[in-house]
From Swiss-Prot:
A Pfam family that the UniProt record links to this protein: Abhydrolase_1
Protein species of origin: Legionella pneumophila (strain Paris)
GO biological processes: biotin biosynthetic process
Enzyme Commission number(s) of this protein: 3.1.1.85
Protein name, as recorded: Pimeloyl-[acyl-carrier protein] methyl ester esterase
Active site feature: 77, 192, 220
Length: 239
């Protein structure tokens, strides 16, 4: 089973994982800013874009076979869970870990800020009815109505959406995160309703060796709403 990759530019390899409901096309607006310095490798996660459904172990093996020996890895939202798991399990391959409005655990519990699982279920139900309309409304909300021409090339499969929902609801790396010793940064948006800024305060206490960046006027998509700040942060972090 092949994993679909798109490559742009030359330089240090930078692998990008998209979020739930999207595919690697979500990164297209920032590629011109990144490709002068990096070899950008855009990945379609299982069940999204042109990558078929597969379990984690199959995904990891197939992906690592297609990637350079060492690379920086960035994941947005659900993609951050994939990126974190890969960094935990393959520390010799991942040189830098960048988590963009992501969390080691998305669902809230008594001592962890997050979102109620019903939020994702409602989003899933809306996606199942009208994918294009739901994603465009989601983007508009996160960008505070800023214009963004997003074209969905390959809608996610129902299986991909359901599998992603399961990942968001069950994957929990809060304990394993303590194993990570590579340079790691977490980016938060103060207006983000999905990864609340309260998460940042708890993570700063529990994982003091990581770097944390807060985008004061951003919501869940700072790489699109505040691209210049995002690119500056990436260039400062990846040496």
């Amino acid at each position: 089973m092949n994993i679909h990759l798109d490559k742009h530019g030359q330089g240090m390899p930078l692998v990008l994982f998209h979020g739930w409901g999207f595919d690697n096309q979500i990164w297209q607006p920032i590629i011109p800013y990144l490709k002068p310095k990096y070899q950008i490798i855009l990945v379609d996660l299982p069940g999204f874009g042109l990558t078929p459904m597969m379990d984690w172990e199959s995904f990891k093996k197939n992906l690592l076979d297609q990637l350079p020996d060492k690379f920086a890895l960035a994941g947005w939202s659900m993609g951050g869970l994939y990126a974190t798991r890969l960094a935990i399990e393959e520390p010799a391959r991942v040189q830098y870990l960048i988590n963009i409005t992501s969390s080691p655990r998305f669902i809230s519990d008594i001592d962890w800020p997050g979102v109620a699982e019903e939020v994702f279920v409602n989003f899933y139900n809306n996606l199942s009815k009208d994918i294009n309309k739901t994603l465009k409304e989601f983007i508009s909300l996160q960008l505070n109505k800023m214009k963004f021409d997003f074209k969905i090339g390959n809608p996610p499969s129902p299986e991909g959406l359901a599998f992603g929902l399961e990942i968001l609801g069950t994957w929990d790396f809060r304990e394993q995160l303590k194993q990570i010793t590579i340079p790691t940064v977490y980016l938060f948006g103060r207006l983000d309703p999905i990864t609340p800024v309260k998460t940042m305060a708890i993570m700063e206490k529990n994982y003091p060796n990581f770097k944390y960046v807060l985008f004061n006027r951003a919501a869940h998509m700072p790489f699109l709403s505040h691209t210049d700040l995002f690119i500056t942060m990436m260039d400062e972090f990846i040496k």
